[in-house]
């Protein structure tokens, strides 16, 4: 955060927020969390072991906020510039004991009540006619691979959009999708919830790539500015 603030003249939209919260996401088996354990803690309110997705330390499924709110008629969205089976987005729809179980995690989309999921494609969706794509469409869940295609999907139909960033076109999926996300989820009568992740801040940190950390953080901060409007 401070690197991005320094690069941006000391200003961030995040710093304009009047209320912030603190969640301790350390796992049950270590002092330091990973994205799976932290994502599960954020999505469910319950700590677990590292590497687990939506399951407790014993491997039992834990209800996530997407499921809890959907049961009350609230519209829900999961948005990320990571792959759709990345640890953080999957914690909001999947229940698997190991974060590397990509195929099994992707298949949990078949039973997730999430109304809108936008994230980068992964191997499970390698072909437009993949088995998982066919199974989703059989459940009347639309699957598309470009944001503009969302306008063709009825507002009351669940949809998964498999699109990631395209830096060659200066296309950042979480920024470009924001207005569409709000429009679709606002169609419900009981409010909405959406989790939006800027995953590449972390990826830049792992690579010790300061430019990526700052660039991605400022991208996410622009999104925060839109949300505060």
Q: What are these regions, as identified by a protein language model?
A:
Residues 87-88, 126-128, 171, 204:
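Short helix/loop capping segments that flank catalytic or ligand/cofactor-binding pockets
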Residues 87-92, 165, 181, 189-228:
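Active-site His/acidic residue clusters
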Residues 1-125, 132-150:
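N-terminal catalytic scaffold of extracellular/periplasmic and nuclease hydrolases
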Residues 129, 155, 174, 217-220, ...:
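Active-site-proximal structural scaffolding
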Residues 98, 170-178, 216-220:
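Phosphate/oxyanion-binding active-site loops and adjacent basic polyanion-contact surfaces
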Residues 45-49, 155-168, 202-207:
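Gly-rich Lys/Arg/Thr-decorated short loops/hinges at beta-loop-alpha junctions or inter-strand turns
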Residues 144-146, 150-162, 177-199:
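Active-site regions of oxyanion-processing enzymes, predominantly non-cytosolic
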Residues 65-66, 105, 177-182, 224:
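Generic hydrophobic alpha-helical segments
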